[in-house]
Amino acid sequence: YAHLDQIDLNENDPITARWSAEAPYHSDKSTHLWIAKQAIEIMKTESNIEANKQAVDFLNYPQYKDLFSKGLYDADYNAEFNDGGTGIGGVFKGGWKSHFYDPDTKENYRGETNPTALTQGKKYFYESGEHLRNKDYEKAFYYLGVATHYFTDATQPMHAANFTAIDTRAIKYHSYFENYVTTIQNQFAVNTGGNYNNSLSTPEEWIDYAARVAKPEIQNITNDKTFKYYNSGKAQLWQEMVTPAVQRSLGEAQRNTAGFLNLWFKTFTKNVKAPSIETALIYDIEGNVIEAGKNYYIVPSESPYQGLTFEWYLANRYDYVTLANKENNGLSGTPMEFEFYKENDAKLHHGESIYLRMKHSNYDQFQYLNWSNYSSWIHLAQKSDSLADFKIKINLDNPTEYNIFTDDYPLNYENINAKKNWIVLGEKKQKPSSWKFIP
């Protein structure tokens, strides 16, 4: 599902503009994530099933939930999960051949038995389990997300039948189909009926089973009529034709993904208890939980009067983030808001992804902290799918202080005593600056 970058023939493609590789937590833009979240809802409803409550507790713990979601998303975009080489037909960079698996031939669309959605799903199922056994929970849930991505690939009829985006009968139909699915998937959400088939005892058996369930629907999605309507620009007609198959496929995908996740938790988490969400809450200096809709000053622990603020930079006319100047030991800076994703509970937790928004700036709407590959300086930007998200983490050396990260880079200040103190991204292995939050 949702390999929209497969159709990036040119930068003006109308579909690619709707998708970003930097929005991993939005289920309305990723059918993979939507299916996984629905599977977790099913397991929550059916908590009497062995390992289901444990799965829900782990996958709803904010830090692990985010890492799981990131793994689901990265599987489409990180080179280590894309074994396509030159690409589909030598045209596309990448190729995603490891995201396909025909259960009858055991092959991907290139006629190879490795890599496929089955071989890679199996690989990361066990790799994530090993990380959990080694108590590296962050890697465990990230790679479980990757494994689940490959599993949900197998639930998509086109991926189970090796129908690609450059099939000459309907160029890019694969991608337009997946885009259409994201617009209607909520109509077909289920929250009961998880498939916990005990006869399927390995990840490869589950992936093969899911593909066998999905593949027969290909005749209802790719046929002479749907191709005719698609090629003549009659989107409404082909969409009406495929909708019943989409409904059936998504129903099976949600229920079977619950079974796949159930197997992982039964296999690897016996006698392992999920941490309490209460232990992960982030607090301001007055001891209150950080919440959505409230304003805070973000200040260095060593200089609690210098809040983050902004300054216009003439060279490129951006607002850049700095520390406010000291003003007679009086608090200075720009109030900020922690902006949550709509699916979060509006209380901030350790390792949870949020946006950081200044309450005002020199440009309307350009108020969100962001960064680019061209500079380590933090600047202000508009809200978009490519906007940087930040994670607040408890400083283990001093639990009353916090570190701030984006994509594993620490948010740091350069020199607390400098006249101008720009906020920059440190190196991943560099000691992070410590921060506190003043309401």
Where does each model-flagged region fall?
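Surface-exposed interaction patches
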Residues: 150-153, 410-412
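An acidic- and aromatic-residue-enriched active-site/binding cleft used to recognize and process polar
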Residues: 153, 157-160, 301, 313
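N-terminal, motif-rich segments that launch catalysis or mediate targeting to/interaction with membranes
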Residues: 2-135, 139-142, 157-275
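Lectin-like carbohydrate-binding module/patch detector with strong preference for beta-trefoil
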Residues: 277-439
